[in-house]
Design a protein with these regions (language model features):
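Catalytic "initiation/cleavage/transfer" segments centered on a nucleophilic residue
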Residues: 117-174
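Signature for HUH/AEP ssDNA processing cores
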Residues: 1-94, 98-120
Length: 174
């Protein structure tokens, strides 16, 4: 199946094998799934390391202390210049993946995580370019929408740049 914009999909007469990336075209399945947590530090901020990120999550949501999770740097992390050996970009964005028994519960869980992160002090307001206050937590709440994609494949780099994210790390539960 190919993804496209709704506008293009309608213009092309709703072609077979193509769907728009809109919420009404996707759903969370009943049964097992994967909850993805997307962490991007503020542009001018120092990113949390893996241990501090997991600790912040578990402090806010103690029920996750027993949950194993998979950690992996985002496509924005660990870019090096192979000619100089210089790290052009270190650890920035990160993902945590948690197996869930009922994926259709992900939106509700995401809302509960957001409330818990605010209560734990792991949230803030950002100011938009128009001056509006934007509610933010350490995890991007928009990823709990059905039509959000996880761009997990890594960065497409041209020589002499290369991404060296390593392998995903299994973070055990307590």
């Amino acid at each position: 199946i190919r993804l496209t914009t709704k506008e293009k999909w309608l213009e092309e007469g709703r072609p077979e094998g193509t769907i728009p990336r809109t919420a009404d075209m996707f759903r969370w399945p009943e049964g097992g799934g994967v909850l993805m947590l997307d962490y991007d530090p503020p542009p001018d901020g120092i990113p949390l390391n893996r241990e501090d990120l997991v600790s912040a999550l578990r402090r806010a949501v103690p029920g996750l202390c027993d949950a194993a999770m998979l950690w992996w740097p985002s496509a924005s992390s660990f870019i090096i210049n192979t000619e100089t050996g210089q790290q052009v970009r270190g650890l920035r964005g990160q993902r945590l993946y948690i197996l869930v028994a009922n994926a259709s519960d992900i939106p509700r869980a995401g809302k509960a995580f957001t409330e818990a992160l605010w209560a734990a002090g792991s949230a803030y307001f950002a100011v938009s370019t128009s001056g509006s206050l934007l509610s933010r937590t350490i995890f991007d709440g928009s990823v709990w929408q059905t039509n959000r994609l996880d761009f997990a494949a890594g960065a497409a780099c041209r020589a002499p740049l290369r991404q060296e994210r390593g392998e995903p790390v299994l973070v055990p539960g307590a």
